[in-house]
């Protein structure tokens, strides 16, 4: 769906990168096929021009300069904004006269992120986009992405382990486990369906006896249980505390189940 930012979440080995590679035509699926507007994506330049995937892998000749890579990208992605790419490189402190092979892990990620933010296609897939970036560069990336997204409607699909960082950015959550989609829901609706209860072990156990528990933590004499459902705050005893779950904690409990 266009004009939406998705978070693709899953544990290591869950199949996130494989799924993105299949969707973007990098590899062929064992069964089934990926279509866009009724046309198969794999080995279809017309459809592939509507899709871009940024990942850890470099698809450019390593001896190529960053500036030349920008020009090269425009040959395939005709709406690539080279002027904006140069401007973003300046913001991130990326020298465009550097060869790609000389870039550090962080600046290699920045180079690929700039490409992703300037290709101007309907579907942009970002696989671990902030790998190697320091806190300042990560914050700059999220800000620039939101600014670009606001003025250029597109679907952004972000696959990342930094769930807490992206939780305020993404609008739709997709969680996969063992190669299958566990859930797909808007972030707000998802977080409204779960909550946590904290208090003494006995008080929490009494409250949660008839609830749908998805996980629990115990520290000393205190216990927290994580519950699927909507709390009736009028019936909450005074000796327990009800709080909303954050996305990272919910992800951990759902994928540990």
What are these regions (language model features)?
Residues 1, 32-43:
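Conserved ABC transporter NBD signature motif
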Residues 10-15:
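Walker A (P-loop) phosphate-binding loop of ABC-type ATPase nucleotide-binding domains
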Residues 24:
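Helix-to-loop junction immediately C-terminal to a conserved catalytic motif
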Residues 30-33, 178:
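Conserved coupling/switch loops of ABC nucleotide-binding domains, chiefly the family-specific signature
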Residues 46, 55-112:
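ABC-family P-loop ATPase nucleotide-binding domains
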Residues 124-128, 133:
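Catalytic Walker B motif of ABC-type/P-loop ATPase nucleotide-binding domains
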Residues 141-227:
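ABC transporter nucleotide-binding domain
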Residues 215-257:
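C-terminal coupling/interaction segments
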